Amino acid sequence: MQENIQNAIQEAIENAPERKFVESFEMAITLKDVDLKNPVNRIQEEVRLPSGRGKEVRIAMFAGSEMATKARAAGINVIDPSTIEDLGGNRQQARKMAKQYDFFLAEIPHMGTVGRYLDVVPRPRGKMPRPVPPTLDPAMIANGLQSTTIVRSRDKVTFHTAFGSREQGMEELTANAMAIWTRVTSKLERGAGNIRSCYVKTSMGPAIKVEVIE
C-alpha cells in the first residue's frame, strides 16, 4: 500500500501547477459498508504525523495572567477569557475565529465558560479547546499539535484531512499519508475492505486515485 500511496503523491506533484503560495497535501477517503448513523462507527482520530505538517499550525488559547504569558512565549495567540461571553453572542465572529485557528487550548477554569457560550461553534468543527492544567506549560501541548492532524468522518462516508505540504519531500509525505491510512484502517471492522476509494491531491491540484489493496 505504501508504494501505491507514494506513486499517487508523485503523480499529484507532477500534475499540480506552480502556485504563489505553499499548498497543503490532502487525503480524501470514502468508506463503504459502514453504518455512520451509529456514532461508534465514526472516525474521530488525532494522528501524529511522523514528518510534521510541513507548515505552521495556528493555535489559540483562552488564558489570563501568568498562563497567558507562557502561551505568548510559546507562539500561541492568546484570547482574553473576558471576551468569551461576547463571542458567544456574536455567532459570525465566533465562526470566523474557529476558522482562523487549527487548535484551541484553554485554562481549566475557563473550560466551563467556553462550553456554555461557544460550544455550538467549535464542537461541530472538532475544535473544542483542550484543557491545560495550571502546572503544565502550554508549550508542551503546542509542540505536539504542530505535527498533529485531525481525521474526522462525522456521519459522512467521504472525509478529508491534510497530511503535509509541497515543501516536504516524497519520503516525508509518504510517511505521513501512511500514518493516516494505518490509523483509519485499524478502526474499521474489515480494514481496507471498508474503504471504497482514496485520493491524494495538493490544495488546488487534481485528485489522484490511490489503488486500494484490501
Q: Predicted regions: what is each one?
A:
Residues N7-N15:
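Interdomain regulatory linker/hinge segments that flank or connect interaction modules
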Residues M1:
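OB-fold/S1-family RNA-binding modules
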Residues K20-S24, K187-Y199:
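Flexible, glycine/charged-enriched surface loops at secondary-structure junctions
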Residues S82-K187:
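Long, charge-patterned amphipathic alpha-helical coiled-coil/hairpin "stalk" segments used as oligomerization
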Residues N15-T69, D86-A94:
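Translation machinery proteins
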